[in-house]
Amino acid sequence: MAKFECTDEVTNFLTELPKCEHHLHLEGTLEPELLFQLVERNGVQLPGTFPKTVNELHVIYNNFADLQDFLNYYYIGCNVLLSEDDFFELAWSYFKRVSTQGLRHAEVFYDPQSHTSRGISLEVVTKGFERACAKAQEEFNISTKLIMCLLRHCPVEECMDTVKSAKSLIESGVIDGLGLDSSERPFPPELFVECYQLAKSYNKELQLTAHAGEEGDPSFVTNTLDLLETTRIDHGVRSIEDAELIKRLAAQKVMLTLCPLSNVKLQVVKDVSELPLQEFLDNDVPFSINSDDPAYFGGYILQNYLEVYSRFGWSKAVWAKIARQSIEGSWCDPKRKQELLSEVSEVVNKYVNLP
């Protein structure tokens, strides 16, 4: 439950505070309104049991039982995306929305296998998203990175084929990073070692991350770091259960990309206040605050910041630390990092009366 009031001054400060988003699935920004527009435009047939109206779909989104329940709707939603313009429109809608929320840098996920399995080429999907990223830079000065995710519930051979088909996009740097998502516990990181090694062989500059420690125990995090050689962990909340792992994350500056509202919606915790955010701060484990699949989980990045404030009531200095470590943990170049760090200082100095 909320313990601290988000006053107008707090809300304004958190809105203006420069933000980096590192855990955002572009397909997870598919709002019900756009979903039904694309159904109409593309003549897509949804399952007979699927909600018939925007309001009915919102009710479903407010009551997911767990990760798998959410994923079932997430993959149905992907079926309405067919053309390059569809993918562009989806991502552009996201960038427009967060441009007013202080977002300055976005490293965004997408799931090609959700689309190639329907006969849509990797190039079509990537080009649509790439166009939206370029427009976000041009119109909003939001810098971006594209992270291609492998779906861990798919056969490993199919994941390997996806990496092979992305060879030229990885070599050219259009794809900046490789990630791993979907159902965690049945599909541990050790299954995907060769996929990661192959992708890295295409471009030594390719960044590596993976979902771990959301539903899986801390060993999923440790094995992801050791076997997949990632430099970042997506989610990672259950790392707190392993004291040695916490020391390692702090020492190696492995950033956790945390998603508070997602963790509540998918029953990882009952309330944002139960998340070990203060423990991560106390132990110098770097983390960023992100929205995951905001169309499904009831809040974009600013709402996640506000929800965290309402539970923890952190001072301006703590929020500045979170903003700075989010920038330092980003994959943008040093010049861009310095620009963003300067922006953080400007905003912090502006709110002189805020504790």
Swiss-Prot record:
Coiled coil: none annotated. It catalyses: adenine + H2O + H(+) = hypoxanthine + NH4(+). Zn(2+) binds at H23, H25, H211, D292. The record marks H235 as: Important for catalytic activity. It is found in: Cytoplasm; Nucleus. Its cofactor is Zn(2+). GO terms for cellular component: cytosol; nucleus. The active site is at E214 (proton donor). It is an enzyme of class 3 (hydrolase). Binds 1 zinc ion per subunit. Transmembrane segments: none annotated. It comes from the Eukaryota. GO terms for molecular function: adenine deaminase activity; zinc ion binding. Catalyzes the hydrolytic deamination of adenine to hypoxanthine. Plays an important role in the purine salvage pathway and in nitrogen catabolism. This is Adenine deaminase. The lineage of its organism: Eukaryota, Fungi, Dikarya, Ascomycota, Saccharomycotina.
